[in-house]
């Protein structure tokens, strides 16, 4: 079983940015797991301008914005798996996933980031135990 310092579930903008930032801060062994056929998440469907002003100081379409983050991940040599569904994350951070190439497989993580974007489920639907578990933040926390 492969071991990673960080496993990120979701290859959209949040997952890609988290991976690049983690690499820049000294995390060497990173795996992004994405269920779709390409990285970029929902941005690939957002053809209007308006992305990137804060991060890249220019106005970009969703696909252009996603491409910048994808390039950041590729430039840093961060590993990723596409068309891969996470089936389980155990309390000891063992991630069980599956895809056509590898079948069912497990990786051990030292840390896990759930960056599942607009498809994110509530904490209860994710079966994360406890009322207010430490270190668990959902996209809804910003609102």
Kindly label every feature range from the protein language model.
Residues 4-64:
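Beta1-alpha1 glycine-rich phosphate/pyrophosphate-binding loop at the start
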């Amino acid at each position: 079983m492969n071991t990673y310092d960080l496993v990120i579930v979701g290859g959209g903008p949040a997952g890609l940015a988290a991976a690049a930032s983690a690499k820049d801060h000294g995390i060497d062994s990173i795996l992004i797991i994405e269920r779709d056929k390409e990285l970029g998440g929902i941005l690939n469907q957002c053809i209007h301008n308006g992305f990137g002003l804060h991060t890249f100081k220019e106005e970009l379409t969703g696909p252009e914005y996603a491409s910048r983050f994808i390039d950041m991940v590729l430039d840093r040599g961060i590993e990723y798996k596409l068309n891969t569904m996470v089936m389980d994350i155990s309390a000891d951070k063992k991630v069980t996933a599956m895809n056509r190439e590898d079948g069912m497989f497990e990786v051990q993580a030292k840390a896990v980031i759930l960056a599942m974007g607009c498809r994110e489920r509530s904490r209860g639907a994710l079966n994360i135990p406890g009322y207010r578990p430490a270190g668990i933040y959902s996209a809804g926390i910003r609102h």
